Amino acid sequence: MLNVILLGTGGGMPMPNRFLSSVVMNFKGRKILLDCGEGTQVTMRVNGTGFKSIDIICISHLHGDHIYGLPGLLSTIGNSGRVEDIYIIGPKGIKEVIEGFLITLPYLPYKLNILEDASNLEFMVKKEKMELVEEDEKISSDLSIKTLELDHSSPCLGYSFNIRRGRKFNLEKALMNKVPKEVWSKLQRNEEVSLNGVKYYSYMVLGDERKGIKLSYTTDTRPTEDIPGFIKESDLYICEGTYGSEEDMHKAIKNKHMTFKEAANLAKRGQVKELLLTHFSPAINDPKEFINNAREAFENSHVGSDGEERVLNFKK
């Protein structure tokens, strides 16, 4: 099960009814934060998400409405008692920006691992943290994060998250591979085991991969030809809808953003299950007034609001 909360759905500047861009995902009690606009700490408190269990922070790009909440949040996480490493993923330039922020944070009780312009990352999800691992055919990770270069006025990344579903134990396979019974349980937990000088791997006792959960996130971009394939068959697609009306197309093109209908066309082409729109222009008072513009292209389109939640489950 993956729990998703829209912490902020505004673009440009915070509004009385909308915080700036941020999304938090919770899987097995560990959290991933997508963007960190001004006020993210406040809306996290409002939604009761907690701070200490954030393991990965993914930044789409370096415009202020997506990163100005980061210095304060990093400080608060430090005050929460966290000592485990945190991964920050972002576009080219993210390292320099974080190093600048750290001037105001001379002491943090945890290490920041900054992954700049990374494209394919694999993580194991443990009880106490998420941990970056090397891609290995013998060991299946719990989470993969892929990025895509978008078309904005500064380097910008889209993100796709694939939560893998644990494979079932296969007795026939375990016996065929002559795996001792005493290591079966550890291999089912995806651990590498050595016994009497022989190494055993989880693939020796587990069946075929099962369909997992896919969430994709693209914000602050024009539509590109690569996006539909990148978001293909996502269970949830969170996408910017800066402008509700096609009458604002000239603004969307000039500022390198999207209209509701453009986002919906991408959702349709990508065959996603649900489109959740976010990052609304301050000029839009009620984004729901424009939802039909999206539904003309993709019926299962919804306007996101601060605090809105989705629960994505593995299919039986």
Swiss-Prot record:
Quaternary structure and partners: Homodimer.
Cofactors (names): Zn(2+)
Keywords: Endonuclease, Hydrolase, Metal-binding, Nuclease, tRNA processing, Zinc
Species, as recorded: Clostridium perfringens (strain ATCC 13124 / DSM 756 / JCM 1290 / NCIMB 6125 / NCTC 8237 / Type A)
Ranges in coiled-coil conformation: none
Residues at which Zn(2+) 2 binds: D65, H66, D220, H279
Enzyme class, first EC level, given as a word: hydrolase
Any GO molecular function: 3'-tRNA processing endoribonuclease activity
Reactions accelerated catalytically: Endonucleolytic cleavage of RNA, removing extra 3' nucleotides from tRNA precursor, generating 3' termini of tRNAs. A 3'-hydroxy group is left at the tRNA terminus and a 5'-phosphoryl group is left at the trailer molecule
Cofactor: how and how many bound: Binds 2 Zn(2+) ions.
Name assigned to this protein: Ribonuclease Z
